[in-house]
Curated annotation (Swiss-Prot):
It comes from the Archaea. Keywords: GTP-binding, Hydrolase, Nucleotide-binding. This is GPN-loop GTPase PAB0955. Homodimer. Interacts with DNA topoisomerase VI subunit B (top6B), DNA primase DnaG and RF-C. The lineage of its organism: Archaea, Methanobacteriati, Methanobacteriota, Thermococci, Thermococcales. Belongs to the GPN-loop GTPase family.
Length: 248
């Protein structure tokens, strides 16, 4: 089974990858893949590490700025695309789980040919789109997260599950509020209708058609610190694999 973690910088993606892997290692054979050319340290031992071929730091010494170096690093990774793809496919055959950690600059993986082609060639990968509770301040934000998960699904051609990370930092009242907004579309739509702004109207219209365009997927509530939600993620990954990508 291949699980791909994507998320914005600071969402806790890499820490979650490592801790979920250690959780799985109690019962399964697990391999890790690091696709972040800019990361300094990892909380896991990768079987495949793109930094062995190229790093952002090395490219910046050539005169590139930080953003340009990230893009250039992925341009250079394309030279080794088939090699990395074949290595990952071998890992998938030799292990129960392959956990793929993507760049902290999420757009690098989503919009570069390397990420898209890789996902097109992997067998039934499950994408976990990780969000930080800090970005969820108003009803519009929940609408954004659900639709962005759909956009990732469309872009990568892989089932994408939205996940709220760092839930150990939330009170029970806050957790319940997040669940209400994520899981009760009627409630979210009603709240959005109260916002008279142009953004509120747009979010309301998008949310109103959510049941028509969004597949019925579950939202995960995770914590790398307490391992909350890990059993749910394990179950969902198993169901995804056994149904060949259909979680409906």
């Amino acid at each position: 089974m291949i699980v791909v973690f994507v998320g914005t910088a600071g969402s806790g993606k890499t820490t979650l990858t490592g801790e979920f892997g250690r959780y799985l290692e109690d019962n399964y054979k697990v391999a890790y893949v690091n696709l972040d050319t800019g990361v300094k340290e990892l909380p896991y031992e990768p079987s495949i590490d793109v930094r062995e071929f190229v790093t952002v730091e090395e490219i910046m010494r050539e005169g590139y700025g930080p953003n340009g170096a990230i893009v250039e690093s992925y341009d250079r990774l394309m030279e080794k695309f088939n090699e990395y793809l074949n290595k990952i496919l071998r890992l998938e055959k030799e292990n129960d789980y392959v956990l793929i950690d993507t760049p902290g600059q999420m757009e690098t993986f989503l919009f570069h040919e390397f990420g898209v082609r890789l996902m097109e060639n992997l067998p039934y990968p499950l994408v976990v789109y990780i969000s930080d509770p800090e970005i969820l301040k108003k009803p519009n934000d929940y609408c954004f997260v659900r639709f962005f998960a759909l956009l990732i699904d469309l872009r990568l051609g892989a089932t994408t599950i939205p996940a709220l990370n760092k839930v150990d930092l939330l009170s029970e009242e806050e957790k319940e509020r997040h669940r209400k907004y994520f899981e009760d579309i009627d409630y979210l739509t009603a709240r959005l209708k109260l916002d008279p702004s142009m953004q509120g109207l747009m979010a309301y219209k998008m949310c109103s058609m959510m049941t028509e365009v969004l597949p019925p997927v579950r939202v995960l509530y995770l914590s790398a610190k307490t391992r909350e939600g890990f059993e749910d993620l394990e179950t969902l990954a198993y169901e995804h694999y056994c149904t060949c990508g259909d979680l409906t």
